[in-house]
Each structure stands twice: as C-alpha cells, then as structure tokens.
C-alpha cells in the first residue's frame, strides 16, 4: 500500500506549461562602506550573525551568474574565516524575489556539452561547500525562489519563508529543456521524498509556501505584515530577517535543531523507498507516464529521472556526476534552444516598447457579454481595472456576469483567492444595457459579432458618447482594422486587440495597428494588455493579421488531408506526435467549424488560390447540419458534457463521401502529412515577416506558440527554420509544390535564407 501511495502521488504530473516570470520590486538596504565594492552580494553583522543580502542592481530579479557566484564564494569565505561570526542568514533585498534562478545566458556561449557541464559542476561545488558549512546558514525566503535559487536555499541548513502568494518555490528547468544542475536532482529527493521531487522536477510547477512547509521543503513560515510607517513589503522583509537572525542564533547556540520531525506518511514513504523493488516500480511508473505525455519530443524529463536514479542507486558522487553530464547534454539540444528562445521572447513581449501612454486607462468598457467579452472583463477586473460590461439583452448580460463570477469563484476553490477578495474584485464590474458611464471611459473594447456592419454601428455609437481621448479597440480575429476604422471620426484612436479563447487561460494578446493608429494609442493598448497579464505581440493590419493568417492555410491543408481519407483520430495523433498540444481536427472543433468557415471564406477572397487546398464546402455542410464543434456538442467528434472521452462523429463520413480527393502516394506518408501541415504554417509566418506584418521573429514565434499551439519543442516557426535548416524547409515545400501547386511555393525570404546558410533569423 505504501508503495502504491508513493507511486500514486505522481498522478499530479501534468503536461508542459510555459514558464511565467514574476516581476520584483527593488528595496534598499544599508551595509558597511568597506563592503560596497561588491555589486550583487554584501553582508553586515548583527551580534554574531552575518546577514548576507542579495540585490542585483538594475534588475527586477536576482539571478545567479558567474559574477554573483564569485561574490557569494568570497563572502562565505570571509564569514567562515571570521571567528566572531557563528551563523548566517541569506536574504534578498528585493521583497518580491529571493532568487529567480540561474542566468540562462551563461549557456548561450557554450559550444560543447563539456562546457555546459562545467557550469553545472561549479554550481555543485559552491552549494556543496554551503551544505557542509561549519556555521549554520538560514535561507530567509520572500518572493520567487526558483531554479538555482531553490538549489541555493536547499543547500542551506534551514529555510524560513513568508506565507504569501508571491512566495513560490520550484525548479522550472524542465520548461527550458534542461534539468536542475546545481545539486537539485540529488538534494530534492532526500528532502521531500522521491515522488514529490519527481513531481516538482518533471512538471516545473511552482509550490506555494504553505504547501512547501507541508512537504518539508520549508522549515518555518512567517506571516506577512500589513502597512505601517513603511510599506507592507518592507515591513515583512524586516520581520522575516529578524525571525531568521534569532533562529540562526538558536542554531549556533544549539538551542534549536534544524532537523524537522517527519509525519507518519512521510516516514512510511521513506521506508518504502529503501526497498529496491519499490524504487524500481516508481522509476518504471514515472518513465511510462513521461513517455506517454512527452511522446519522445522532450529529452529533459527522462534525463532527470536518470540523474535521480543514479544518485539513489549508486551514491552521491555518481549522482552529481550524472547530473552535470546530463545537464551538459541537454543544454546543447535543439529542444533546449527552442524553449530558452521562447522564454527570452516572453520576456521581450512583456515589455512596452512604445513607452508610457500619455493617459493611464482607469475606466474600461466592454461591448458584448458573450464568451470573449466576459473573458476580457474577467482578466480586467481581476487586475483591478474598473470595467463596464454592456450587452443588448438581460439574458446575455446575466450570462456574462455569471461567467466572470464563476471564473473568480474557481480561484476561491483553488485557494488562490479568499471569498472576500473575490467579492471585492467582482465589485469592479458593472453590467448594463445602455451607454451610461461611457462618458468616463478611457478605452472601449468591442467583442460583438464578427460582422463589419455590426462593428461599424457600435463604433459610431461609442464615439458619440465617449470623450475625445477614448480608445476604441476591436477584438476581431480576422476583419481588417482599417475597414472597421473607415467610419471613425478618430481613426488614430482605433486599434485591434485580438484575445484568444478562453481569455483567462490563453496568455497571448495580438495587438493590430493601422497606418493611422497613433503611437500613444498603441502604448495604451499594450499597457492595458500587460496589466491584464498578457504576453503581447504588436502586428500591422491586414487580412487575418498574423495568427489567423498562419492558421488558415494550415487548416486548409488539414481539410484536404481529411478529404484524402485520413480519419480525424489519426490526423490528431500525427499532429500531437509532432508536438502540437492539440490535434488538428480537435483544434478545428475547438475554434468552431462556423468560425473556421467564416475565416476560410474571407481569407480565401483576400489571398486567392494560395490559401486553397481543402474544400470550404466541407465546413459549409458541417455548419448546415449543426456540427459546429465542441460548442454544439458535435463536430469532427461527439462531445458529452462532463466527459473527457470523445468519439468520432460518424455522420462526417456521409458528408465526406462526395468530397473525397485521391491521395497522392508520394506525399501521403505519415511524415509527409506532418510536414504538409507544418510547412504551410511556417511559410505563411515567414511571409508575414517579409511583408512587414510582423516586426520581429521573436514576436512571430511567441504568437505561434502562445496563440496557436505551435509545438513548443520547435520554438516557433522562425526558430524551427533556424534549427531544422532553411534549405530543408524549402526542399520540403518544393516537394509538395510539385504535387499541389502554388499553395506550397516557398516565399522569397525563405529562399534567401536557403541560398545563404550563414543567414538566420536568430544570429
């Protein structure tokens, strides 16, 4: 039973998610003038306790790089050599961040696995010295303690953390395609148990402080303080330091012990893991789960398992060696380069490159309380924006308000909010059927039906009741913004803000500017999106913008493949097997067959035969029979409420029978089907950069992965071209062009890169 429980606790293992970085606030501190020569780490002495403060300048977060490591070793050597110091406290001067991790840019210059492995070994040696410190060191944690930051903390003799939402602990290296390389794979299993350690390392999930305490990852919690003469953050940090200093004194005086007693279940699990058979069963179960979920596309999880297994079965020395070697191997893989590229792209897309807007948006108004409008309202009020939600019917408005409340209440169930906080946030939302209050609106976002006439109508109405400075943003997914703005009296204030469904889950926001959109309007739209917690790309106006324009030719190819006789389940298996989180046929059902038809027709008119392939007639017939996808319960699949299982909709065969296309054997292998889907997407993405729709490859990759589910392991269409090779992409396109024509003709920019192997999107 104990063995099954140890294995069962791994059931929380989830599929890959993308790392969300946390912003941190700077906080000043005082230190002795003799120590000011150090940039990142200084210390002062309180009685016989050294208080080591980490504070990387000109950065919102503390990260571990070679300079920080050098200063840390220098400081620790001084402390160990000073007989007046008997213990130490390690604390950050940034209230929202302990240490956010190691600086991944250290790996950028590595050209061999051995170079990367040396970086791992240096970290291991530093933390081993800390672990064996003759003077106890207490880690005082407030804010994010991630990656190398957690490895630093668990090498200390004791850990105290603030019990608030900003304090999270985790090892997200797997999300970057690598593993914890400074001893994490060896210390974590001993500290929290093998099942919990696997769960942390294989998912990269963040652990909140209260949960970390129950796991044994943190030894003591400190409640945050409220406001006083100083801010709550400053008061909490000072209190945390005071508690940590007192405990460090107690450790040095041997009045308290760093060893925590384990509960019965922890003792039973630890005992079970001493039995070789149980350990082998755990390894086997975890490996099988990893292989099933990653489909062999991500090498890091299996290497994490190997490193842990080596340490447990062969001892510490072998474990640390395995960790550093596997870290070096992973750092040079295409997958890690792709995932690190996405991380860097995310950081770029969370900044407002258009500067601060002249006027901050304080009052937001949203037109349309449907799925999208209510979703936009939820992410707005959740971040403190006062929001008006207008609809034309009482029923529609009520449904929208209920959706917002449910979204907030779900957070209460997950203990992310209290019921008081939920009600306070919900009070920021005012629902109405008229334009009352719009005279104070700084921005109006319309989420009405995708019909140009309807959008023209509401634009005119909005401009008649809002102030001159008010921005009008359209949440259209395909209609050109310049066409919407054609009836505007203030075209410089009109912009596109394309959200993705479900709005509270999807991170991407695609902002679309016309030739007349002012820079200040763009800056305001980006500022609102960032406040809503979005990752933002800004693109030029045009049919389909960037994301819908890339999706349309890919979906056209999907329809053709279905017409050629590949059933939806096989197509889904092939596309998820290539790295898409959702299969192609399932994606069509999720988007909505009616929406797919609408987009296919509009973009078909705009781009002609190049967007051809599959017959739009298939979509039309499905819509006529009410097969709209998940929202209607039937699409390519049949969906049942409350059930994750789905069966093929056999009635689709009756529709397809008159639309069958003969498959071409030379381009119909499983691999060809995968590359037909991916290359049409990639070619269109590169063409968007060529035409100036996209400003940078980074935004193109972020938009594709975060908005459309392009395989994260490939890093986005532009990173894929760099890693796979432009010439190979062009060769693939030429092969399919010979079978299908101009739909696969490679764009000029791709051909240019193929002709010059030294040119890449990322130099």
Swiss-Prot record:
It is found in: Mitochondrion; Mitochondrion inner membrane. The record marks 151, 173 as: Important for long-chain enoyl-CoA hydratase activity. It catalyses: a (3S)-3-hydroxyacyl-CoA = a (2E)-enoyl-CoA + H2O; a 4-saturated-(3S)-3-hydroxyacyl-CoA = a (3E)-enoyl-CoA + H2O; (3S)-hydroxyoctanoyl-CoA = (2E)-octenoyl-CoA + H2O; (3S)-3-hydroxydodecanoyl-CoA = (2E)-dodecenoyl-CoA + H2O. InterPro entries: 3-OHacyl-CoA_DH_CS, 3-OHacyl-CoA_DH_NAD-bd, 3HC_DH_C, 6-PGluconate_DH-like_C_sf, ClpP/crotonase-like_dom_sf, Enoyl-CoA_hyd/isom_CS, Enoyl-CoA_hydra/iso, Fa_ox_alpha_mit. The modification Omega-N-methylarginine is found at residue 399. GO terms for biological process: cardiolipin acyl-chain remodeling; fatty acid beta-oxidation; response to insulin; response to xenobiotic stimulus. Pathway: Lipid metabolism; fatty acid beta-oxidation. The record marks 498 as: Important for hydroxyacyl-coenzyme A dehydrogenase activity. GO terms for molecular function: 3-hydroxyacyl-CoA dehydratase activity; 3-hydroxyacyl-CoA dehydrogenase activity; acetyl-CoA C-acyltransferase activity; enoyl-CoA hydratase activity; fatty-acyl-CoA binding; long-chain-3-hydroxyacyl-CoA dehydrogenase activity; NAD binding; NAD+ binding. The modification N6-acetyllysine is found at residues 46, 60, 129, 166, 214, 249, 289, 295, 303, 326, 334, 350, 353, 406, 411, 436, 460, 505, 519, 540, 569, 644, 664, 728, 735, 759. The modification Phosphothreonine is found at residue 395. The modification N6-succinyllysine is found at residues 46, 60, 166, 213-214, 230, 249, 303, 326, 334, 350, 406, 411, 415, 436, 440, 460, 505, 519, 569, 620, 634, 644, 646, 664, 728, 759. GO terms for cellular component: mitochondrial fatty acid beta-oxidation multienzyme complex; mitochondrial inner membrane; mitochondrial nucleoid; mitochondrion. Residues 1-36 form a transit peptide. The modification Phosphoserine is found at residues 231, 419, 650. Its main location: mitochondrion. CDD domains: crotonase-like (cd06558). In the N-terminal section; belongs to the enoyl-CoA hydratase/isomerase family. Heterotetramer of 2 alpha/HADHA and 2 beta/HADHB subunits; forms the mitochondrial trifunctional enzyme. Also purified as higher order heterooligomers including a 4 alpha/HADHA and 4 beta/HADHB heterooligomer which physiological significance remains unclear. The mitochondrial trifunctional enzyme interacts with MTLN. This is Trifunctional enzyme subunit alpha, mitochondrial. It comes from Rattus norvegicus.
